[in-house]
């Protein structure tokens, strides 16, 4: 691997979240939650954001915990790719 290729892969952001929708073809909606400290009161508040991520094989289902990685824009709303499954959804 060349030096330029190493720095390119390390610049991509990765996030971990839950799949909340798998209804689209080759796309999943991933909810990423993070805790942020309130600037004035100091209390930790839960913030969340939804990302559309590319799922080439339609293998990830609702409830799965996945890692997504930033990539090139694939559509108007989709520029993230699911890189791996962290934890499968529990079936009740």
Swiss-Prot record:
Organism: Cupriavidus pinatubonensis (strain JMP 134 / LMG 1197) (Cupriavidus necator (strain JMP 134))
Transmembrane segments: none
Protein name (database record): Small ribosomal subunit protein uS17
GO biological process: translation
The keyword DNA damage is annotated on this UniProt entry: no
Similarity annotation: Belongs to the universal ribosomal protein uS17 family.
Keyword annotations: Ribonucleoprotein, Ribosomal protein, RNA-binding, rRNA-binding
UniProt-recorded Gene Ontology molecular function terms: rRNA binding; structural constituent of ribosome
One cellular component term from this protein's GO annotations in UniProt: cytosolic small ribosomal subunit
CDD domains (UniProt xref): Ribosomal_uS17
Subunit and partners: Part of the 30S ribosomal subunit.
Primary role: One of the primary rRNA binding proteins, it binds specifically to the 5'-end of 16S ribosomal RNA.
């Amino acid at each position: 691997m060349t030096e330029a290729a190493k720095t390119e892969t390390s610049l991509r952001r990765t996030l971990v979240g839950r799949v909340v929708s798998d209804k689209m073809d080759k796309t999943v909606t991933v909810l990423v939650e993070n805790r942020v400290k309130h600037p004035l009161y100091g209390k930790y508040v839960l913030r969340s954001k939804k990302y559309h991520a590319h799922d080439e094989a339609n293998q990830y289902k609702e409830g799965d915990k996945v890692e997504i990685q930033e990539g090139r824009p694939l559509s108007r709303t989709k520029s993230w790719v699911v890189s791996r499954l962290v934890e499968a959804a529990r079936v009740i």
